[in-house]
């Protein structure tokens, strides 16, 4: 499922047998219709970014619900897939903030310690938020609580009202929060553009004596 250290820490914030409930939910969901991402990628964010290496969280809401888009990392799509509108705006802000990045696949961010987590880890094809409120929120809230317990600083990047509500779980004064409106076309001009989250994150990390993220990689 998830990286083993993640697994043990997350369990401490969940009711007993919650992992069993998740597996039952996944069995039923994938048996009853088309669900994104592919099942082997549901926990990809936790598999490719170990807890001990996580220094940034970018929280999304749920996976892309179009064909071949979702890959288990928030806002990221496979390289051969056209960038969805929110990712287009993220890359536009990145270009204005630091420089141009042509890649749509954000896996290189994940490998540098950026946890690309969605609050819901699955979605029915064509139904945005179709699995919201069913199983995932206690699990992904637990991920945030685990990060909150880290001794080393974490930068939490929270875009949009939904993500910003998760500030309630970030109580450790060692951590930092960068928040703005969501990069979606509906809200990007209300304060996402010009918010410079990438350079601000690196400034925080470097001030804390940590290596910044190569956002253009």
Curated annotation (Swiss-Prot):
Location(s) in or outside the cell: Cytoplasm
Predominant localisation class: cytoplasm
Reactions catalysed according to its record: Hydrolyzes single-stranded DNA or mismatched double-stranded DNA and polynucleotides, releasing free uracil
GO MF, one annotated term: uracil DNA N-glycosylase activity
E.C. code: 3.2.2.27
GO process annotations (BP): base-excision repair, AP site formation via deaminated base removal
Active site: 62 (proton acceptor)
Origin: domain of life: Bacteria
One GO location term (cellular component): cytoplasm
Gene3D superfamilies noted in UniProt: Uracil-DNA glycosylase-like domain
Key word DNA repair present: yes
Family: Belongs to the uracil-DNA glycosylase (UDG) superfamily. UNG family.
Record-linked HAMAP family: UDG (MF_00148)
Functional description taken from the UniProt entry: Excises uracil residues from the DNA which can arise as a result of misincorporation of dUMP residues by DNA polymerase or due to deamination of cytosine.
Protein name as annotated: Uracil-DNA glycosylase
């Amino acid at each position: 499922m998830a990286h083993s250290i993640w697994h043990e820490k997350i369990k401490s914030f969940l009711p007993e047998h919650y992992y069993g409930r998740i597996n039952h939910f996944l069995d039923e969901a994938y048996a009853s219709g088309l669900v994104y991402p592919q099942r082997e990628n549901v926990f990809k964010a936790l598999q490719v970014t170990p807890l001990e290496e996580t220094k940034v969280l970018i929280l999304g809401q749920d996976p892309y619900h179009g064909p071949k888009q979702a890959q288990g990392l928030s806002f990221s799509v496979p390289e051969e897939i056209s960038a969805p509108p929110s990712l287009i705006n993220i890359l536009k802000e990145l270009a204005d903030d630091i420089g141009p990045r042509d890649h749509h696949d954000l896996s290189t961010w994940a490998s540098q310690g950026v946890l690309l987590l969605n609050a819901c880890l699955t979605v029915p094809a064509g139904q945005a938020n179709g699995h919201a409120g069913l199983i995932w929120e206690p699990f992904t809230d637990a991920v945030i609580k685990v990060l909150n317990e880290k001794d080393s600083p974490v930068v939490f990047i929270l875009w949009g009202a939904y993500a910003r509500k998760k500030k309630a779980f970030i109580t450790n004064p060692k951590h930092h929060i960068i928040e703005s409106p969501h990069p979606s076309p509906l809200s990007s001009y209300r304060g996402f553009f010009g918010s410079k989250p990438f350079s601000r994150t690196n400034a925080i990390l470097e001030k804390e004596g940590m290596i910044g993220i190569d956002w253009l990689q």
